[in-house]
């Protein structure tokens, strides 16, 4: 799980680096084509058909739509915001999943978990700093702040939709078509964004690195969920923010302000608390099953 989070953080950093040379729509399209190619080969190697009626399941379609929102929103946020800020906001996704499960799925959420969700959003506000103390992210870059929130909401929607995907839909097949919708997203963005450019050799290296680490992240997180106990490995998702902060300093020469660190710690603490409460709630249910 830790390796997968390091891979995803590295992939995110390559998106931001590439955005200095290519428009976002072009990055999305290259990423989608690369990921689709890798996972298509994985499907063929495992004897899994690329096309089947299963990919038309409403949950798979909903996951694809959420993937478009998440990818477009977060990619554009990465191009506009500091890497550390965008990565910290990303950590609130599990809290939005809890919120969505309560509202859309009618799951029972205790007041303790509700409190943790609210506290987590307070952490986001501390990072964005709408009050304008020292640095107001909303005022400096309102589009980037909004896109980050849109992106993380899309990620939460993707996770919620994944819960309803039938078990007979292989993960690798779902991932293949997940990257396919990223290609579609890139095409749609190209209609409204900057014109494409011919990438240089070094830019293609960035794109290839992005695809490699994105695929490594997916394969390793899938392995972690299958090999280890989900309740045991899930908290290690938050190591992603550690790697993101290291990369933000090492690659982008960003300064980690106390405000960003405090906000990120609050979000992570709230997320881990929600996970602990959900784990305790699941134990009695398993005992009664």
Say what each PLM segment does.
Residues 1, 54-64, 109-122, 141-145, ...:
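Cytoplasmic-side transmembrane-helix entry/capping segments in multi-pass membrane proteins
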Residues 7, 47-85, 90, 126, ...:
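Specific transmembrane alpha-helical segments of multi-pass solute transporters/efflux pumps
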């Amino acid at each position: 799980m830790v390796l997968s989070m390091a891979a995803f953080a590295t992939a995110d950093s390559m998106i931001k680096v590439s955005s200095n040379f290519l428009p976002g729509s072009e990055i999305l399209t290259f990423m989608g084509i690369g990921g689709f190619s890798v996972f298509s080969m994985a499907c063929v190697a495992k004897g899994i058909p690329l096309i089947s009626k299963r990919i038309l399941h409403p949950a798979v379609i909903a996951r694809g739509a959420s993937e478009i929102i998440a990818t477009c929103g977060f990619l554009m946020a990465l191009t506009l915001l500091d890497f550390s800020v965008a990565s910290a906001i990303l950590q609130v996704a599990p809290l939005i999943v809890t919120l969505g499960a309560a509202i859309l799925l009618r799951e029972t959420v205790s007041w303790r978990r509700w409190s943790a969700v609210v506290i987590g959003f307070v952490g986001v506000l501390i990072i964005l700093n709408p009050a304008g103390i020292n640095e107001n992210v909303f005022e400096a870059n309102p589009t980037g702040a909004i896109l980050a929130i849109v992106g993380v909401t899309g990620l939460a929607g993707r996770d919620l939709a994944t819960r309803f995907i039938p078990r007979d839909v292989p993960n690798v097949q779902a991932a293949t078509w997940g990257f396919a919708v990223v290609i579609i997203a890139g095409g749609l963005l190209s209609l409204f964004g900057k014109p494409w450019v011919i990438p240089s050799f070094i830019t293609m290296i960035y794109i290839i690195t992005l695809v490699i680490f994105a695929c490594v992240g997916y394969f390793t997180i899938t392995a972690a969920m299958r090999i280890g106990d989900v309740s045991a490995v899930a908290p290690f998702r938050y190591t992603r923010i550690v790697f993101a902060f290291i990369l933000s300093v090492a690659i982008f020469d960003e300064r980690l302000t106390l405000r960003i660190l405090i906000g990120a710690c609050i979000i992570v603490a709230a997320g881990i608390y929600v996970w602990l409460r959900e784990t305790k709630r699941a134990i009695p249910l398993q005992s009664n099953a």
